[in-house]
Structures are given as C-alpha cells and as structure tokens.
Amino acid sequence: MVQTKNFPLETRGEAVSREALVQAALKEITQNYREASLSNVAREYGVSLAYVSECVRAETGRTYKELLQKHRMETAARLLRRSDMNIQQIISLVGYENTSYFYRLFHERYGLSPREYRLVRTGTAPRRPTA
C-alpha cells in the first residue's frame, strides 16, 4: 500500500497514520534522547526505517538526526544554565560519546564553547574540583 499524507498505512493488520509515526518519533526524541533511535519506532510499528525517516522529514521539514541533535543541544544548554554539572557529565547525559563532536555541534549552534556559554549565561565559571 502506498502511503500518502492523509491516508493510513496498513501494518500488522492495523491502520497507522503518518502523523502517528511522526508523533512516535518525536516522543522517542523527547523521552529517550540519550539513546534515541528511529529503529525503535520502525520496529514498534512494523515499518521500514526508511519509511519512518521519510515521514518525519515530510511532516517536519527536518531529518530525524537534525531533530535529535536540536533536542540534545537545547537540553545541554539548559543544563549548562541551570545546573552545576561539569561539562563532561552533561555531554554524556545528553547522549554524546565523542566530546570533540559535541563541542563542534555546540559551537556551531550557539557560537560559543560550552564553558563560554555557561559563563555568559550565568555570569559564573563552573566550580573546579579541589585536589
């Protein structure tokens, strides 16, 4: 069955709308952003990864990866403003394993390093552990 924007997709004997798939993908991002995977949504609904990806892009104008990165960066920025967690803890918490990659994405989005962002937004430098 070919899916169009307003017609349901038959899967596992049930009708699933594109909107339901997109909402499930967005829910995966907001509730499981550290380990979010579009594969989870595809598996849950019994559809292909490519199909869910296409639905997300068609409905939001962005790829799943772009939406996930946006949510992770916004969460990291909020934690930098509102917590005294160190930057490495925040990087891990929001789901990045590669620190350099996180720093690059953060700088591209906010024009500052995470440390600079925290300093500018809170007016205080993070506490350093004493030896």
Per-segment meaning from a language model:
Residues E35, S39-H71, I91-E116:
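Basic/polar phosphate-binding segments, predominantly the helix-turn-helix DNA-binding elements
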Residues R18-V22:
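The cytosolic transmitter module of two-component sensor histidine kinases
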Residues Q23-Q31, A58-E97, L119-A131:
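Terminal helix-turn-helix DNA-binding modules in bacterial transcription factors
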Residues F7, R12, S17, R104-A131:
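…primarily DNA-binding HTH/wHTH and HhH modules…
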Residues Q3-E10, E14, A24-S37, C55-T60, ...:
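Basic, amphipathic alpha-helical hairpins
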